[in-house]
UniProtKB/Swiss-Prot annotation:
Source organism of this protein record: Salmonella gallinarum (strain 287/91 / NCTC 13346)
Function: Catalyzes the reversible formation of fructose 6-phosphate from dihydroxyacetone and D-glyceraldehyde 3-phosphate via an aldolization reaction.
The enzyme's E.C. designation: 4.1.2.-
Reaction equation(s) it catalyzes: beta-D-fructose 6-phosphate = dihydroxyacetone + D-glyceraldehyde 3-phosphate
A GO molecular-function annotation: fructose 6-phosphate aldolase activity
Alphabetized HAMAP family for the sequence: F6P_aldolase
Disulfide bonds: none
Name this protein carries in UniProt: Fructose-6-phosphate aldolase
Any one Gene Ontology BP term: fructose metabolic process
Family to which the UniProt record says this protein belongs: Belongs to the transaldolase family. Type 3A subfamily.
Main subcellular localisation: cytoplasm
NCBIfam families noted in UniProt: fsa_talC_mipB (TIGR00875), PRK12653.1 (NF009296)
Subunit structure: Homodecamer.
Gene name as annotated: fsa
């Protein structure tokens, strides 16, 4: 299983990388824009934060296949081994096919249906990123879509994997993992929610109080 953080906040990546067993960091144009940093400045800093073995994801901006391929090559030259995120449009599928031949690893992003995700995988994307909460927000069933996509990839594109994205709650992320997803990416607030469990703090405080009452200190 691969766990990623969905952010361009270098300080938070450094903080959470000490705690979470993260495989890397995913970004998108909105996330990079929110950081107020040039993508060419922030990507090296993110790579440094996750280490040489961490995987970094960044997205192209062009709307046509030729431009996507050119931008993907620029990203790959700047950060060798980066996974390039390509929106799964008609032009995006064409770009994924071309990049597969070039040996550049891709992720098919902005996936709102299982069929769309399958096409990305068949075109050559190593990762496919379904938008769980956004599907829910449009009246669909994000988890059901992920389940269908996971089954389709297992049967027809076993070299590709679901990297589920767009979460508002830890429960959504866990449901994707229960559906068989091999990778998820968490926004910072959802990652923090996984750490903040009031019942755990209450239990620890009770242990400490009992120990202190018995021994007068909190030392072993």
């Amino acid at each position: 299983m691969e766990l990623y953080l969905d952010t361009a906040n270098v300080a938070e990546v450094e903080r959470l990388a000490r705690i979470f067993p993260i495989a890397g960091v995913t970004t998108n144009p909105s996330i990079v824009a929110a950081s107020k940093e040039s993508i060419w400045d922030v990507l090296p800093r993110l790579q440094n934060a996750i280490g040489e073995e961490g995987t970094l994801f960044a997205q192209t901006m062009s709307r046509n296949a030729k431009g996507m391929v050119e931008e993907a090559k620029r990203l790959n030259n700047a950060i060798p081994g980066i996974v390039v995120k390509i929106p799964v449009t008609a032009e995006g599928l064409a770009a994924i096919k071309l990049l597969k031949k070039e040996g550049i690893v891709t992720l098919g992003t902005a996936v709102y249906s299982a069929s769309q995700g399958l096409l990305a995988a068949l075109a050559g994307a190593k990762y496919v990123a379904p938008y769980v909460n956004r599907v829910d927000a449009q009246g669909g069933d994000g988890i059901r879509m992920v389940q269908e996509l996971q089954t389709l990839l297992e049967h027809h594109a076993p070299d590709s994997m679901v990297l589920a994205a767009s979460f508002k709650t830890p429960r959504q992320a866990l449901d994707c993992l229960l559906a068989g997803c091999q990778a998820i990416t968490l926004p910072l607030d959802v990652a923090q929610q996984m750490l903040n469990t009031p019942a755990v703090e209450s239990a620890i405080e009770k242990f400490e109080q009992d120990w202190k009452n018995a021994f007068g200190n909190l030392n072993l």
